[in-house]
UniProtKB/Swiss-Prot annotation:
Gene3D superfamilies: 3.90.940.10. InterPro entries: DNA-dir_RNA_pol_omega (IPR003716), Pol_omega/Rpo6/RPB6 (IPR006110), RPB6/omega-like_sf (IPR036161). This is DNA-directed RNA polymerase subunit omega. It comes from the Bacteria. The RNAP catalytic core consists of 2 alpha, 1 beta, 1 beta' and 1 omega subunit. When a sigma factor is associated with the core the holoenzyme is formed, which can initiate transcription. The gene is rpoZ.
Length: 118
């Protein structure tokens, strides 16, 4: 069996950097348990991935999309949770005043009115 070389794959992926990135990603997929699309023939995963690219059993566009998805970081965007202090402050403003506070305010008003008359 002839060994696969990079030259066999350059026809499919002209940029050698892209070829190396795609072959490395496919080799990691194989190592993770992805099914092979060519016979292994006692070759290691990087060689198998290059053979798959050369034989076009792995479409380059699909492989590129999978590689991009694997490199992307998913960030969840949720509404910020209100912290406990904000909740407490909001509850303080919405809460009706107790009768004691109302009577204190009323007494203070009466005292100020009485001082204003004198």
């Amino acid at each position: 069996m002839a060994r696969v070389t990079v030259e066999d794959c350059v026809d499919k992926v002209p940029n050698r950097f892209d070829l190396v990135m795609l072959a490395a990603h496919r080799a990691r997929e194989i190592a993770a348990g992805s099914p092979l699309t060519v016979d292994r023939d006692n070759d290691k995963n990087p060689v198998v991935s290059l053979r798959e690219i050369a034989d076009e059993t792995q479409p380059v566009d699909d492989l590129r999309e999978r590689m991009i998805e694997a490199q992307q970081t998913q960030i969840e965007v949720d509404e910020p949770e209100e912290d406990a202090m904000a909740l407490l402050l909001g509850a303080e403003m919405d809460r009706p005043k107790p009768a004691d506070e109302e009577s204190e305010e009323r007494m203070l008003r009466m005292m100020l009115e009485a001082q204003g008359r004198n």
